């Protein structure tokens, strides 16, 4: 999406690490946004998950935090319009969304956020890799583009 110029110019893409170690990358991003006095409308955390694999879902929405009811309605509308099978897990395993939703200080309150995950099969933390359904890639990319570019 980035290489093809399919993301709005207002979209900030940050590659973070250390999710398994207290989400240090997400904390660093929050601190940087605070220093730069950036107003952020939403954060989308991209990840893999075992949720939805057995249901053959193309993607899952997990750990949604801080969206108002109208924005939530618009997100559901986008999901329904996609016509793609997805799984919704309001409170899944902790991830970076928990950091983004807390904010970094009184200067930078929590950011509405969710995790957009690709369902996989296998040990996500092992050395053997995981299985990903090829049929999930295009719908995942499509909903990511729509969510990232959406103005709610």
Give the residues covered by each predicted segment.
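Acidic/histidine-rich catalytic neighborhood of metal-dependent amide-processing enzymes
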Residues: 1-65, 94-102
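Active-site-adjacent substrate-binding region
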Residues: 57-152
